[in-house]
Amino acid sequence: GLADGIVVTPSHNPPRDGGFKYNPPHGGPADSDATSWIAKRANEILEKGWRSVDRVLGSDLLEHPCIHRFDYLAYYVDQLDQVIDIDAIREAGVRIGADPLGGASVDYWGAIAERYGLELTVVNPKVDPAWSFMTLDWDGKIRMDCSSPYAMASLRDAMTPDENGNTPYDIATGNDADSDRHGIVTPDGLMNPNHYLAVAIEYLFTHRPNWPAEAAVGKTLVSSALIDRVADSIGRKLVEVPVGFKYFVPGLVSAELGFGGEESAGASFLRKDGTVWSTDKDGIILALLASEILAVTG
């Protein structure tokens, strides 16, 4: 069955700004009615000094009939080839450097490399509560923002060609703490998120023959007009929504949208067979898609 989802994460913000992220059973972001209720209830609890909160020992949690372990990692990794042409990546021998920026994808990238036999290196597998491995963002704060050239400085430096024009990876990628955002680094530097979304859209809609013929391109109102021109060039309807990935959820579920993306380096798209993959942003598939594009188009 379906369940609600809760993630405690700072996302791409400073670690001290850890937040409570709620996803209803459809998997996408919650609407404002739900988030407003959660915020109101949380503030009520805080005002009372936690006295109304029941406490349970961690050792007793798994004894509760409503709590059990689930192997999200294996479940996710085993299905990746349904949304990404991983065979093409492996056969082309694309060398990938994946930096989880100390976030939730750290174990996923290693499992992906092993499961599919990819030339993939987890650039920084370190998990450090002090975030000592992070370069500071533009304002001097630690921020796991994979779309920031400051936060991605280490990966950008690693991809700088040597005197012979060589780099350790053909493509490098980063994810934020909860891995719903992506950053793509080539020897030329960190790609502009809007530019990569435009490339991804053009590629997907011309290399997914089993997608519905009427599936549209989804973008937020503040995303680049480049996407409008790409949608027009490939003969696909463009659907503009207000800022917020939650507005893409119905279209992704029904496959009326083949792709939904927002300017802040977050997107998702359909499986290869044209059915829904994720109703929230998935930074891992967007990162792997860059390697697929390189493998297929050179």
PLM feature spans:
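General beta-strand structural signal in soluble alpha/beta enzymes
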Residues: 6-8, 98, 122-124, 173-175, ...
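Gly/Ser/Thr-enriched, mixed-charge loops and adjacent short helices
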Residues: 18-167
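Phosphate-binding and adjacent anionic-ligand microenvironments
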Residues: 167-171, 184-187, 207-298
